[in-house]
Amino acid sequence: MKDLLKFLKAQTKTEEFDAIKIALASPDMIRSWSFGEVKKPETINYRTFKPERDGLFCARIFGPVKDYECLCGKYKRLKHRGVICEKCGVEVTQTKVRRERMGHIELASPTAHIWFLKSLPSRIGLLLDMPLRDIERVLYFESYVVIEGGMTNLERQQILTEEQYLDALEEFGDEFDAKMGAEAIQALLKSMDLEQECETLREELNETNSETKRKKLTKRIKLLEAFVQSGNKPEWMILTVLPVLPPDLRPLVPLDGGRFATSDLNDLYRRVINRNNRLKRLLDLAAPDIIVRNEKRMLQEAVDALLDNGRRGRAITGSNKRPLKSLADMIKGKQGRFRQNLLGKRVDYSGRSVITVGPYLRLHQCGLPKKMALELFKPFIYGKLELRGLATTIKAAKKMVEREEAVVWDILDEVIREHPVLLNRAPTLHRLGIQAFEPVLIEGKAIQLHPLVCAAYNADFDGDQMAVHVPLTLEAQLEARALMMSTNNILSPANGEPIIVPSQDVVLGLYYMTRDCVNAKGEGMVLTGPKEAERIYRAGLASLHARVKVRITEYEKDENGEFVAHTSLKDTTVGRAILWMIVPKGLPFSIVNQALGKKAISKMLNTCYRILGLKPTVIFADQTMYTGFAYAARSGASVGIDDMVIPEKKHEIISEAEAEVAEIQEQFQSGLVTAGERYNKVIDIWAAANDRVSKAMMDNLQTETVINRDGQEEQQVSFNSIYMMADSGARGSAAQIRQLAGMRGLMAKPDGSIIETPITANFREGLNVLQYFISTHGARKGLADTALKTANSGYLTRRLVDVAQDLVVTEDDCGTHEGILMTPVIEGGDVKEPLRDRVLGRVTAEDVLNPGTADILVPRNTLLHEQWCDLLEANSVDAVKVRSVVSCDTDFGVCAHCYGRDLARGHIINKGEAIGVIAAQSIGEPGTQLTMRTFHIGGAASRAAAESSIQVKNKGSIKLSNVKSVVNSSGKLVITSRNTELKLIDEFGRTKESYKVPYGAVMAKGDGEQVAGGETVANWDPHTMPVITEVSGFIRFTDMIDGQTITRQTDELTGLSSLVVLDSAERTTGGKDLRPALKIVDAQGNDVLIPGTDMPAQYFLPGKAIVQLEDGVQISSGDTLARIPQESGGTKDITGGLPRVADLFEARRPKEPAILAEIAGIVSFGKETKGKRRLVITPVDGSDPYEEMIPKWRQLNVFEGERVERGDVISDGPEAPHDILRLRGVHAVTRYIVNEVQDVYRLQGVKINDKHIEVIVRQMLRKATIESAGSSDFLEGEQVEYSRVKIANRELEANGKVGATFSRDLLGITKASLATESFISAASFQETTRVLTEAAVAGKRDELRGLKENVIVGRLIPAGTGYAYHQDRMRRRAAGEQLATPQVTAEDASASLAELLNAGLGGSDNE
């Protein structure tokens, strides 16, 4: 018995480890793992089914086939444990050792490991500095390589063909050494002196200047250093011993009918062993060289196929023409080990079934079919039955349950009480896709789901299925109840708004009961309270919509949180009074005293949560649902064909449009308009007609005429069912009603162009064949798009999760003063997002001052909640600097202050919260709602794009920012700066509108002037760009020679002549180097200086510029000297929707990016080349000028002699995020990405908090490039983790040394995921082979910091409740304590052992 205890103790020992290291295996290492050499390719004997000795399944090497029984049957049972049978050589032990014991094959000739050879960049090639082609030719026995040149003129590593080798042999005899095959490469690798090589390369690096050479050298140095530091030897990349996987991991299973199913690996191993044995035999026989060589090549190919089949040449196929699955295929891809078995496992204690509605459930309940519950909770029931003494053994209990005895159901009730279960609906796009509920037993076979949680699950009842999981341990139940219960997840983690919001029927019911109606039954009554209202409604004395006066008691919270009652008579309706009965204490009556649509209900729940907290909100939500369902049923609202009222005006609107189209057609035929213009106009006419029809229809539906009690006619909001459904937000929208009762409108062809004849019919009238046929395309495209969208969106989510998975809140406050300046989002005249929405739930980075004073309004480090935001709004603050994760100083993870409020809980975020995953889910989950297509702007839209003036909407004062201007002769301001912004400020100092003002715009009102709403404040010519003079004087032409640099053109219509500057391509050779310019001189002919500088005013003219002035004319400042026609770039497609979001997060460079100024200085143009011009920026402080070549066809925004700041736009276009980061810094690029992503989501009406996007941006900015190393051990130009540089610099500065300087890098999310420090995480994401190869060569150590790594090694994740566990481990490790392993006492062990023996181990004695 005491032995047994030892044995049990050995079994309970868990592996304790803190990191995982990956490295190259040396031949000795492989032999030390091995339990014996596999010498034969045989697997099992076909008659006895016993493994062959020394074969691939040999019992002597790998262990016994049956528990505690040797192969020949001499020793059986536990008492012989550990004996090695002298007859068959098998150790008597458990059979599970066949899963862990490895074997090996001694290769007769060394073979290269294909991963280190072919995985680009080739490690062997990089190390030897030889091209991959040459190495392959040596390895596959096509050429020789010189290993030792000796005294000859042959270089080491020189490649020789067969002929060259024979010549060399004749010439030098055995002076030199040249070989072929892997032996040659092995010899080369063995003889390398890594340290020496490293030194030489470093010296070379310091001497060289060429960028490409530097890159190459840095790569080699890094690789060599990796080998030196990790202790890997380069020759280990060539295998001399091949490990053999344990047999139970590559099983051979007999099928019925005498056939066998086998793992492909066995085939691949057999090939290797066969060829290896043949090679050994040939070597023993001293066979001719060519035969041996061929056999060696075959062996090399066999080993390649085993490691990574298909990586080189054709994949080896099995009997069924399918390529065999090699070791590499086992781990990579969706079906590989990582993604199939380690990151996603199937779990026990789970079941799935169809879902149906449970409208009578409470929010925290779900209906669970009895059958399912019985199956899921079986072990608990067995336990209870035994405990009660109702069953003597587990077996008896099992029988009782199978018979479904009455007592079993009682016990099931007990077991289930207070035991939450998890419900999950696939696809689980965000964390609300799994929530916990308390089960209620129901008859039937479908799970019942509470209607209010459908929004979170995105579930409907058209056949959706859901899975149920049972949390077993007490801890799991606790977590399910405290964190995952549906009642704890009322707010959405994406935007902090309620997600438990009524929809559809419930909304319709509440809307119906809160509407009022003129002259309804019972109008004008005065009631004592809501109770009486309900009584008279039930008695039929009053209609639900009757306008009445009711005595209402409201409760308000005072400072102490006590409720204070206010009672008053309110004008309301019967329905609203009845609804007031379910509203919790503490909310004002005004909240229900309106027609409640979906938005209003959502706001109501939100207010309730903020004022009263969780519990009342949950109860209120449930009550609203019950009430809504009840009154929706009472309302009897339904849809009939007569509800779709077609407006009378429709007919005349359509005939008007047809007349206009006919007119355009005539103009086209008489040649007044082009085909393109005609098409665009026709489409505009029909689009306008469609709008008019739908407006007429909505006006018609919206109101109805009724007679009030004084007998007069009155308009009131309509009670049309369809209108009510749309107006309340229950179902449908104006656009859909338009198709039912208006006209369907314009349709698109499959290629995306619009068909110019619209469908004038609607669905009520019905479509004719042609109209139906036109419609089919759109319908199909919709379905196809949806399928594509789902896949794309899922992939985006996966990449986002992968890049952000290891970001966890790790400390309370990092203490940084950095932050982002938040301002309201204003586009043109609309506030798209007020400041309040942007800063709510953030922490201030510095004190917020009261505008215009020095008083502190909000102190630094304040979490801005609703009350603070009210204060900011009251004092009209329009910019707040808040903390952001992008500027957080925490090394691993972020701090709670930089993140701010946990949106789903409403308080500051807890430590250990996995904000990275939450951010990824919040951005990815609405992905399916985004569009997939790129938008073609055509027709009406493109003409609207050419704006030519700014018209303000509100009154206020104008504020111009970064503006340079001059006053022209008529006293108006003319803008001469490039990126001027015009803001409209109201009387409280808040920004209401904001516009971009182009160069050359003439301002009607100046900075700080008051304007009225609707006033035009600036206008300009949209088609030409002017050149504006900043000084007055006389014009002097320079280098303007007719026929060489300019040509004179006369306009046919007006007879005015103008000078046109020739493009350099059109000039004669003499004119190529001339620079036409206009110089401004005073009356004496002296240069006039530009005010504020010592530069003479001269304006160089680019090609195509038009000058309408003559030499010597007097001009005044602000006049237009020349005009440059702008080519309208046609209609540009804007990428929208998902592809745009993906481009932003992948940080892809746009096709023709904007060109930004690299440094500040004065612009000039140098010598031009064929297709490019040379832009030179000379800094004012006299340091080196910066030059850049720009293609001629790019329109430049700057003139010669103009001053630019770093990061200014030189040529328009979409900005590349990398440039923004380099020139304007981290905050600018964050702002850019956040705003651009938000624009896409805002267009679809999806709300996502900025925080989530910032979290992803932080992960994209993880890396930095070292510019100068200082005293650190980084290499120049090396890319390292930003946190590592920070930590290293901190240590160096503490010791008074010079730190490294670096620049931050922006990586796309895929790149960033693969560049993470953790190789396990990267390997399980994409490009598994490459990641593992790199990691092995560098001998990387994975510290298991992220979530993914910990899931893969099967540990609690370092987030959430696992965070404390990991913190505790770290503490203990730091203190150097032993980590406690669960000790088994002798008593426990013997007791459990006895039970084991009774249960079945001991049953085999009496055979």
Swiss-Prot record:
Q: List, alphabetically, the GO terms of the cellular component aspect.
A: DNA-directed RNA polymerase complex
Gene Ontology BP terms:
DNA-templated transcription
UniProt KW keywords: DNA-directed RNA polymerase, Magnesium, Metal-binding, Nucleotidyltransferase, Transcription, Transferase, Zinc
Binding-site list for Zn(2+) 1: C70, C72, C85, C88
Q: State the CDD domains in the record.
A: RNAP_beta'_C (cd02655), RNAP_beta'_N (cd01609)
Its UniProt entry gives the catalysed reaction(s) as: RNA(n) + a ribonucleoside 5'-triphosphate = RNA(n+1) + diphosphate
Q: Which InterPro entries match?
A: DNA-dir_RpoC_beta_prime (IPR045867), DNA-dir_RpoC_beta_prime_bact (IPR012754), RNA_pol_asu (IPR000722), RNA_pol_N (IPR006592), RNA_pol_Rpb1_1 (IPR007080), RNA_pol_Rpb1_3 (IPR007066), RNA_pol_Rpb1_3_sf (IPR042102), RNA_pol_Rpb1_4 (IPR007083)
- What does the record say about how the cofactor binds? Binds 1 Mg(2+) ion per subunit.
One GO term in the molecular function aspect is: DNA binding
Positions that bind Zn(2+) 2: C814, C888, C895, C898
| SMART domains in the cross-refs | RPOLA_N
**Role of this protein:** DNA-dependent RNA polymerase catalyzes the transcription of DNA into RNA using the four ribonucleoside triphosphates as substrates.
Write out the similarity annotation: Belongs to the RNA polymerase beta' chain family.
Q: What HAMAP family does this protein's entry cite?
A: RNApol_bact_RpoC (MF_01322)
Question: How does this protein assemble?
Answer: The RNAP catalytic core consists of 2 alpha, 1 beta, 1 beta' and 1 omega subunit. When a sigma factor is associated with the core the holoenzyme is formed, which can initiate transcription.
- Listed name of the protein: DNA-directed RNA polymerase subunit beta'
Q: What is the lineage of its organism?
A: Bacteria, Pseudomonadati, Pseudomonadota, Gammaproteobacteria, Enterobacterales
Q: Which gene encodes it?
A: rpoC
